[in-house]
Regions:
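Acidic, Mg2+-coordinating phosphoryl-transfer loop and its flanking beta/alpha structural elements
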Residues: 133-180
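A metal-dependent, Asp-based hydrolase signature
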Residues: 1-53
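Alpha-helix termini
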Residues: 2, 6-13, 66-68, 93-94, ...
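Substrate-recognition "cap/lid" segment bordering the active-site pocket of phosphatases
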Residues: 47, 51-56, 75-132, 138-149
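Catalytic-core regions built around general acid/base machinery
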Residues: 59-71
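Short, acidic/turn-prone active-site loops that include or flank metal/cofactor-
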Residues: 102-110, 159-165, 186-187
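Short acidic-hydrophobic, aromatic-tinged amphipathic segments that line or gate anion-handling sites
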Residues: 179-188
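Short amphipathic alpha-helix with an adjacent loop that forms part of the alpha/beta core around
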Residues: 188-195
Length: 195
């Protein structure tokens, strides 16, 4: 057995069909039923997926406030694929501009965060003059800053309460002069004076 063969099989950045880790992860994440629905092959695991434990942090009030403030221009740039996003947020799916949203799991790996191109695609598609980009990672912050540096005015709102170590995330956002820092996205309407 060649080490290079093993490394190739374990490489997460390979396509789903050739990456053992990618395949196992998706089976655990989606569960047996959804995995078969997506890939048209049975899962080796029979349990329900971790996706069933997703906690949706937005609600109708938040979405309504944002849609009113931003003239219906509400899109997402997410590391998830469209299927996972749609499954978890099915209750709110029709509230987003999915045409101008980017689902990075479905895109080439070189477009992964913090590559700014997916964000710029969304900003251009929405014809946005000033974008509010909400995220909970350093990569999100870097994307927003890069978009602004490139002439696409973007205000980053950093959410720190979703982190395993929120105090460290809060400090990182403060050290980088993030203009809006919130513990939870539920605080957003109040922070933007929308309520």
């Amino acid at each position: 057995i060649e080490i290079s063969d093993i490394k190739e099989k374990l490489n997460y950045s390979n396509p789903h069909e050739t990456s053992y880790i990618y395949t196992v992860f998706d089976q655990i994440f989606y569960g047996a039923e959804l995995y078969e629905e997506i890939y048209d092959i049975p899962s080796k695991f029979l349990e329900s997926g971790l996706i069933e434990k997703d906690k949706v942090l937005i609600d109708s009030e938040i979405i309504s406030s944002l849609k009113n403030k931003f003239d219906e221009k509400l899109a997402v740039v997410t590391g998830r694929g469209k299927f996972a996003f749609s499954y978890s947020l099915k209750k709110f799916l029709n509230k987003f501009d999915l045409v101008n949203s980017v689902f990075l799991e479905d895109e080439s790996k070189d477009l992964a965060k913090p590559n700014v191109e997916p964000l710029l695609k969304s900003i251009r598609g929405l014809n946005s003059k000033h974008c509010l980009y909400i995220g909970d990672s350093m990569e999100d912050m870097l994307m927003a800053n890069k978009a602004t540096d490139m002439g696409f005015k973007t205000t980053f709102c950093g959410i720190f309460g979703t982190s395993k170590k929120p105090e460290i995330k809060l400090e990182m956002f403060k050290e980088n002069n993030v203009p809006i820092i919130l513990e939870s996205i539920t605080q957003l309407p109040k922070a933007l004076n929308l309520v």
